[in-house]
Amino acid sequence: MKFRLILSFLLLTTYVVAFSQQKQSEKSHNQKMTATEKGLIKVSVMYPYAQGKHFGMEYYESKHMPMVAGYLGSNLVKYTIEKGLASGVPDQPLPFMAIGTFYVKSLDEYKAAIAPNRDAIREDILKYTDIVPVILVSEVVR
């Protein structure tokens, strides 16, 4: 009986220690992520959902976003691609079919890189969608 009690106590202690270390590791990772992204410029290119419109995710992911990322050069920290799945409100259409986001160090460098390539970017958009994107430029604060 004492052996079972001691064994149970040791297993429980091991579980608690392991769980707390995992939580601490996740917290540390999230703090590092926040610290490295804080102050970056986030350019979100959002494609609103509309009945009858199309969006070619495969082309967007494999051709368009890498093309634009190439224009941004060393100013680009990372980019993400999101595919809309559902609305946050039940029985409502999703607000966006897709969102592409570029994280850059400098807004001025971003503008300088995009300006001479604007026509090529606009022409390429027609290859994967008939949706007019909404663009939001913001600063990551946390």
Where are these regions (language model features)?
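Macromolecular interaction modules
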Residues: 20-142
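Bacterial Sec-dependent N-terminal signal peptides
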Residues: 1-25
